Amino acid sequence: MAVSNRRIDPTDLRRVHVLTAQRFPHEYLDEGLGAIGLFLHDPPKNAGYRSTPANSITFASTGFDGIHFGSLTDGDLIDPMSPVVITIPMAFEAPNYIVGQTLYDFLCLGCRHGYSNLGNLHLNFEATIEHYQSPPDDFYDERSRDILQTMTDELSLTSWPDVPGRFLDLQSRIIPMLRMPANS
C-alpha cells in the first residue's frame, strides 16, 4: 500500500491547534485539537506507562484513561516520518496499535471524525475500524466538523480509502518494532 511521504512536523500540528482554538472557541469545552481527541503534549516525552513502548515519544493524548499517541523513535525527539502508536493503558492484553506509518498518515486516519474513538480498539475492534471506514454524521461537540475541516485543509489530509486493510497491514509490519520497557 502506497503511503504519502508528506512531512508534517509537530510545529505544524501546534499551529493548527492555535488556529482552531482561535476560530472555534468554546466557553467550557476543550479548545483547538483537544475537541477532536488530540491534546498535544508540550514537551513531548515518553508517557511512562508500563504499556508505553520504550521506543516512543508521546506527543498527544485523547484526554481520557491515559490513552496516548506516540512517535516510534530511538531518540528523544518526534520523528514525523516514523510510525505512530496508540497506547491504551487499560487494555491489558493488547494495549498498543499502530495508527499510522507517519504522523501525516495518522492524521489522515482521523481527519473525518477525530481521534478519541481509537481508544475503543481493544473493546470492539471491528466496530472501531468500521467507525473510521464509514464515520457517523453526528459529533459530540458541534465544533468538531469545522475543526476537522480546518485541519484537513491546512495540512492537506486525505482519509484512508481502505481502513481495515491499511490498519491490518500496519499491525503486521510495525507492531514487531515496539520495544516494551523492562518493567512491563
Residue ranges and their predicted role:
Residues 1-81, 144-184:
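A surface-exposed partner-binding patch
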Residues 84, 128-131, 176:
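Short alpha-helical interface elements
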Residues 82-122:
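Compact, glycine/acidic-enriched structural inserts
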Residues 114-155:
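An amphipathic alpha-helical core segment
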Residues 48, 92-95, 140:
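Generic alpha-helical structural element
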Residues 25, 29, 69-70, 98, ...:
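Compositionally biased, intrinsically disordered low-complexity regions enriched in proline and serine
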